[in-house]
Amino acid sequence: MKTTLILSTALTGMAFVASAQEVNVVSWGGAYEMSQVEAYNKPFTAETGIRVNMIAADNPATPLKAQVEAGNVTADVFDVEVSDAIRLCDEGALIEIDHAALPAAPDGTAAVDDFVEGALLDCAVANIVWGTVISFDTTKFDEGAQPQSAADFFNTADFPGKRGLPRNPKRTLYLALIADGVPAAEIYDVLGTDEGVERAFAKLDTIKSDVVWWEAGAQPVQLLADGEVSMTTVYNGRIFDAMVAENKPFEVIWDGQYMDMDMFVIPKDAPNMEAALQYLKFATDTQRLADQAKYIAYGPARRSSAELVGLYQDGVTEMAPHMPTSPEALENAVMDNPEFWADHDTELTERFNAWLASS
């Protein structure tokens, strides 16, 4: 309760107090981090005088846990996935957040009613909705005969070339089931059975020799750009940046999108707690989340922000069709299920790693 009270007190005031403080934010690097710098950090520093130091990590939850366990917390705000936010909160690593103290929408709607479902947790506040999607190099396939579905991703006979997949079961097993005909709404029911797990691995077996495994978010875009793969799964914001900002000949397949949210959390014993609390409030208000969509194709976690999403920073590209929350993107999308993975992550990861090691 004490940490909740501190947060509530810090967020209640309408204005920020300028100081010579700094706040250390751990995020994911790349185009996503750049979007945070432009939408959150620069205006935050201009308004408060607080310098924002960005630290990139392949998975910010990893250094957060390590710092807490070592008793040496050096960063203040971490951008993590939902499942990690839940786990770290349960482990007592994070402060609790008073949602009533978060900024209301411009029309006065309380934050608890303005954030999308699942965006507010005991110890976390979501900032974006994002997706892992399939992308392909259009130059690798004849016009009029290009891949269109998750099933095509697994069809190397008609759509030849190497495939990029993440080296983890969460964003790999589901796609195998989608490609094998399982509807998105039934993925967790099927994957929760022994038969479903066998079915997923059997489907992965069909392309195992053609897979190039990736771990960091920047890798799949580079794999496509270097011609090492003809198709890959990739974070939708990363591939949007390559397509629009860098004019790469890539396209997105929304079929079988895996949707997730990123959330801001603050560890207990953060060295710049007051600045961290100010940053959390600032970065999750309606306008800042809408502004982020000018720089990357991730959907804001507030309903009031979605109404303000317009053009990309080039002043030409409409962002709405590129959002993971667009109607086309949602047609056969799978939403992350933290409860499922809390129950099954260990066993499926062990099975996945054993499968990787097998011939």
Q: Residue locations for each model-derived region?
A:
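Gram-negative bacterial Sec-dependent N-terminal signal peptides
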Residues: 1-20
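Early extracytoplasmic/lumenal segment of secretory-pathway proteins
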Residues: 21-87
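Extracytoplasmic ligand-binding site segments that recognize negatively charged/polar headgroups
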Residues: 30-35, 81-219
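A ligand-binding cleft/hinge motif common to bilobed small-molecule-binding domains
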Residues: 85-87, 231-249
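A bilobed periplasmic-binding-protein/Venus flytrap-type ligand-binding module shared by bacterial periplasmic
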Residues: 135-140, 177-179, 261-273, 291-294
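Periplasmic-binding protein-like
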Residues: 197-206, 244-270
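Mature extracytoplasmic/periplasmic domains
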Residues: 267-332
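Conserved C-terminal helix/tail region of periplasmic/extracytoplasmic solute-binding proteins
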Residues: 326-359
